[in-house]
């Protein structure tokens, strides 16, 4: 029984070209023979979806199929004007290559004379919170591959030239039959370069590039956070045989700070004050990341955990004219190692204290006493 092309792709009869292509791409990736070696069922499914897509992607063939079904492509069907159009191995390989070429940067992949883009590089950098606040220009040294100046990147000994690979005619790819269709693979004669180097450059050993440490200047903007990535285009490894260089990615991390904790653009810190300052009121100074000293007033009767907000004293937001706030939490320090006189004064203070001085604690113990007395009754 012949397959229904729409069912093979898992689409409706009203599916547009975009839906057809997406369905084919998904199924082709699933059933591709390279992913399912020695699996006849996967090969059969792969052939079915290829046949279905090749028919439905063509408006004329699709119209004929919608009207006459498979009879449109049988001998004599439609006056012999249509075939199944599968075109053997080469036709399907072209379809597959066209679609999946888009996933690899658009269009069909060709070695373009063996040129290869250089690899991207990663560099990890740690900065202080102060540097993240103000921004900085950092000098880094990066070991990387650069174009060989002896052979200008050709890989061939000066005075000689690479020759075109006869196996792939310079494309770097060869077509190989695999069952009912053919696929392109890297040329084994030149390893995908498209060229053969008979006399390699002695400095780079035919690679077209050498390893060297480079010094680069990196601008770190104010407001960066953990994981911020900076891209330096063209500062990665040199390309091969005239190919473009890769990029360098700087991954930034911010060191933990001794006093401040960060949450987005806001900063948090704890400031210890004495019990008497909390009770009588007072003030203290706090150093902020902009280098200034900010005076904070403590009102009488300040409780432990009280939070003060200093607007605009937090972190700048990356590439925006916005700054977060600084939140200061009060940490009341209980006195230790009391002298005899200090103890006497505190004991006297305790005797003079009333419920009005400590309403929360007085109310709590009163409620607790009433609770347990009620249980005993």
Swiss-Prot record:
Residues 4-69 form the J domain. Zn(2+) 1 binds at residues 148, 151, 201, 204. One of its GO terms (molecular function) is heat shock protein binding. A zinc finger (CR-type) spans 135-213. Its cofactor is Zn(2+). Binds 2 Zn(2+) ions per monomer. Keywords: Chaperone, Cytoplasm, DNA replication, Metal-binding, Repeat, Stress response, Zinc, Zinc-finger. GO terms for biological process: chaperone cofactor-dependent protein refolding; DNA replication; protein refolding; response to heat. GO terms for cellular component: cytoplasm. CXXCXGXG motif repeats lie at residues 148-155, 165-172, 187-194, 201-208. SMART domains: DnaJ (SM00271). Zn(2+) 2 binds at residues 165, 168, 187, 190. It is found in: Cytoplasm. Homodimer. Belongs to the DnaJ family. Participates actively in the response to hyperosmotic and heat shock by preventing the aggregation of stress-denatured proteins and by disaggregating proteins, also in an autonomous, DnaK-independent fashion. Unfolded proteins bind initially to DnaJ; upon interaction with the DnaJ-bound protein, DnaK hydrolyzes its bound ATP, resulting in the formation of a stable complex. GrpE releases ADP from DnaK; ATP binding to DnaK triggers the release of the substrate protein, thus completing the reaction cycle. The J domain is necessary and sufficient to stimulate DnaK ATPase activity. Zinc center 1 plays an important role in the autonomous, DnaK-independent chaperone activity of DnaJ. Zinc center 2 is essential for interaction with DnaK and for DnaJ activity. This is Chaperone protein DnaJ. It comes from Brucella canis (strain ATCC 23365 / NCTC 10854 / RM-666). The lineage of its organism: Bacteria, Pseudomonadati, Pseudomonadota, Alphaproteobacteria, Hyphomicrobiales.
